[in-house]
Amino acid sequence: MSVTMREMLEAGCHFGHQTRFWNPKMAPFIFGHRNKIHIINLEKTLPMFQDALKYVRQLAANRGTVLFVGTKRQSREILAEEAGRAGMPYVDARWLGGMLTNFKTVKISIKRLKDMEAAKEAGALETMSKKEALMFEREMEKLEKSIGGIKDMGGIPDAIFVVDVGYHKIAVTEANKLGIPVIGVVDTNHSPEGIDYVIPGNDDSSKAVALYVRGVADAILEGRANAVQEVVEAARGDDEFVEVQEG
């Protein structure tokens, strides 16, 4: 997928925050202001977004994992949907401290959730009292909400993609600590520090968020498709197929 300037304008990617809330470190990406609202320079954003997508494409081609992070109301649904479409893990509820830096502990909760799912599938609820079944369902629901999106992650991701880096400071800090590259949408009220692939843009509009998230999901699918195509072409080679006759 190639994103155009027109699409970014239509999605409102250029609208920043009120000028009084600005972060001076975002000055290089600000075009000006209108009605006390900063306007982001999309001529800077577009190539930076394309660089981020190129990186994601290469990562996916090498079977890398990108963890999608977006827990704000306007990003939750689309983020979970697009991460699912790309077959990638995601966090759409609260970020639990230590989700990356203490992944060993998180893995215990993931195992518990998977065991509960298997037990439910096997009809365990039928052998429980009403109260036990209710408590079981509640615990499972709670685990599904907090870690359901990462239950198949397996290990530390190769990169994280964050919508609104200020809102997800803990996630960014944990990734920085572990040397995990961060792709992040940075609005005018936050700092681009600690973000390896900065996407200067509006992080509040659901239309803008949908554009970034779909773009990253598409890049992952393209990267995977390209890798498969290369394998198929390499397998074909110039060798002629010879059927071996049974003796």
UniProtKB/Swiss-Prot annotation:
InterPro entries: Ribosomal_uS2, Ribosomal_uS2_bac/mit/plastid, Ribosomal_uS2_flav_dom_sf. Gene3D superfamilies: Glucose-6-phosphate isomerase like protein, domain 1, Helix hairpin bin. GO terms for cellular component: cytosolic small ribosomal subunit. The keyword DNA-binding does not apply. Pfam families: Ribosomal_S2 (PF00318). One of its GO terms (molecular function) is structural constituent of ribosome. The keyword Transferase does not apply. GO terms for biological process: translation. HAMAP family: Ribosomal_uS2_B (MF_00291_B). Belongs to the universal ribosomal protein uS2 family. This is Small ribosomal subunit protein uS2. The lineage of its organism: Bacteria, Pseudomonadati, Pseudomonadota, Betaproteobacteria, Burkholderiales. The gene is rpsB.
